[in-house]
Amino acid sequence: MAPFPEEVDVFTAPHWRTKQLVGLYCDKLSKTNFSNNNDFRALLQSLYATFKEFKMHEQIENEYIIGLLQQRSQTIYNVHSDNKLSEMLSLFEKGLKNVKNEYEQLNYAKQLKERLEAFTRDFLPHMKEEEEVFQPMLMEYFTYEELKDIKKKVIAQHCSQKDTAELLRGLSLWNHAEERQKFFKYSVDEKSDKEAEVSEHSTGITHLPPEVMLSIFSYLNPQELCRCSQVSMKWSQLTKTGSLWKHLYPVHWARGDWYSGPATGLDTEPDEEWVKNRKDESRAFHEWDEDADIDESEESVEESIAISIAQMEKRLLHGLIHNVLPYVGTSVKTLVLAYSSAVSSKMVRQILELCPNLEHLDLTQTDISDSAFDSWSWLGCCQSLRHLDLSGCEKITDVALEKISRALGILTSHQSGFLKTSTSKITSTTWKNKDVTMQSTKQYAYLHDLTNKGIGEEIDNEHPWTKPVSSENFTSPYLWMLDAEDLADIEDTVEWRHRNVESLCVVETASNFSCSTSGCFSKDIVGLRTSVCWQQHCASPAFAYCGHSFCCTGTALRTMSALPESSAMCRKASRTRLPRGKDLIYFGSEKSDQETGRVLLFLSLSGCYQITDHGLRVLTLGGGLPYLEHLNLSGCLTITGAGLQDLVSACPSLNDEYFYYCDNINGPHADTASGCQNLQCGFRACCRSGE
């Protein structure tokens, strides 16, 4: 349902506060030691205050919302008659008054948990009903101006309650230092009645609605947000809102530059002196001996400054990974770690796992390896990526490009093209193992076995496969593809079982499949067993074929799903008929004509001298890179013109002005491409570095 205009949405703001309170008491309930009397009583007092606020909230709703709605609609009655708030308050009072010892506390705790769980199950849907049912009715029976006036009164009533500030403090503060300080202050210097009355009716910044606070926080930089998060629990939760952390620049932040806007003007290369300083920092940090004697020389002082900067960067990265990204990672669009002195492959792997919606990733001149991309382990896990800069990452090999290509996803148009091919070339193959007989297609039917159904459900002689496998139901189990000429040792499968392998797939060479794309060299695929990429999640046949020399061969795949229950194994499975009139496999959404994968616009592998033609051809899988405009392969010494041609043919939007590769390669667009950018470069690989 589309959200209602903010000015007339009378439920969302108060309900946000109420839902926060529900989350807080659930968290406290799980952390309370019921054997400890102090913890037990503190929890009950907190719950009592929370439910008093719930009671106040519903009284305001009854008077200013439900009551007015009942006057105009006869269908509304007894909205808050069965919410059990009074019963819960009585339960808390009983616990505070009557429970005396540890045995009674533990018995009471069991009852308390059951009652709270039951209340929460009813209370949250009740709020949802108000937002989805009563709000539209309000829009129907009241004018826009009337609703604006109602919302103002509701917010004012929530803010004017005497106990609101105290409830906020009681629910937000876990340490008792502030409470002791307040007690001491007011016991020594009591305020006059007049001052107390004024303070009760004053409205401070803590009473502002959450949406207003978020608007204020949006003007703060990351350092200021971190300071605000220490003010109170409420502010701590607000500062962890994803919209405040869309763009991350940890390397700049560690050096005092707290910019956190979009990545504009960051693509220009720094001068060599700046790069040298970053390298010196990295070297000093890695060579630093914590137990070494202190050297007071000028050179040592400069080195200690470099070490302290790198240490600051490392602490900042750890803080982001453990304290910020678990909450806001899905909202992060930009991550710039260029020239980082402290970042490691493990850190990058953790960050990428927490940030699946990245659009701009800059890892220029970092000391990462292929393992940094291990978290990109399934098809389309980072399909929003538009800018990827790996310039100067000398440890990057083809393995990383395999993971990157898989993470970019697969084009919808590419999927549909292969579905048409598959329906015309379906052949049946029988795999018999004792009493189990299975049938699959030569190319694509094996993916049906990746659903959660058991063998007994999938193999039914009377009910052929008719339901397409959509991407929404796909659970991405592991799929192991083996070369039929070089099968794995049985000991290897033990390790796979520990890695939660759910399916096993055997690949056989088939010669009757020809790629539909022109210019294919029809070479066989070799070494699939040794490829790390294909030993991960393999979710699409279109990802295994393309119109280039790397993959113009067919495969017949035979799949055995995870072991079913014993009863299923005892039954003899009948051969399964495959309907040819319908699509057997479906990858993608019918609802959108716009591509959601492989939208990369910028790719720089400058100085990645270990990249080969294999890595370039991997990028053509799944539909190529149709939107790529900028491609920098300067310093990639081992690639050839054939590999470049294969990649360029899969990049129809490539701009020759931003296409860079070694001058010694006789490749595509030789007259219009921009050549090598690394000539006489002091910090990037180049075949002419010594000149």
From Swiss-Prot:
Q: How is it modified after translation?
A: Polybiquitinated upon iron and oxygen depletion, leading to its degradation by the proteasome. Ubiquitination is regulated by the hemerythrin-like region that acts as an oxygen and iron sensor. Undergoes constitutive ubiquitin-dependent degradation at the steady state by HERC2.
Q: What is known of its domains?
A: The hemerythrin-like region acts as an oxygen and iron sensor by binding oxygen through a diiron metal-center. In absence of oxygen and iron, the protein is ubiquitinated and degraded.
Q: Under which name does UniProt file this protein?
A: F-box/LRR-repeat protein 5
Q: Name one GO biological process term.
A: SCF-dependent proteasomal ubiquitin-dependent protein catabolic process
User: Any keyword Protease?
Assistant: no
Q: Where in the cell is it found?
A: Cytoplasm, Perinuclear region; Nucleus
Q: Which GO terms describe its cellular component?
A: nucleus; perinuclear region of cytoplasm; SCF ubiquitin ligase complex
Q: Which organism is it from?
A: Pongo abelii
Q: Which cofactor does it need?
A: [2Fe-2S] cluster
Q: What does this protein do?
A: Component of some SCF (SKP1-cullin-F-box) protein ligase complex that plays a central role in iron homeostasis by promoting the ubiquitination and subsequent degradation of IREB2/IRP2. The C-terminal domain of FBXL5 contains a redox-sensitive [2Fe-2S] cluster that, upon oxidation, promotes binding to IRP2 to effect its oxygen-dependent degradation.
Q: Which GO terms describe its molecular function?
A: iron ion binding; iron-sulfur cluster binding
